[in-house]
């Protein structure tokens, strides 16, 4: 539930390496 400051509209979350995932076109962690 914490925004990672990254969007995932066109590309996947680069921050997925830090445990972030795409939700509603924004990358979140927990």
Curated annotation (Swiss-Prot):
Family in the record: Belongs to the cyclotide family. Bracelet subfamily.
Comment on protein domains: The presence of a 'disulfide through disulfide knot' structurally defines this protein as a knottin.
Disulfide bond sites: 4-20, 8-22, 13-27
Functional summary from the UniProt entry: Probably participates in a plant defense mechanism.
Superkingdom classification of source: Eukaryota
GO biological process, one term: defense response
Pfam assignment, any one: Cyclotide
Protein name in the entry: Chassatide C3
């Amino acid at each position: 539930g914490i925004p990672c400051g990254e969007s995932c509209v066109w590309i996947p979350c680069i921050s997925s390496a830090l445990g972030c995932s795409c939700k509603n076109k924004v990358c979140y962690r927990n």
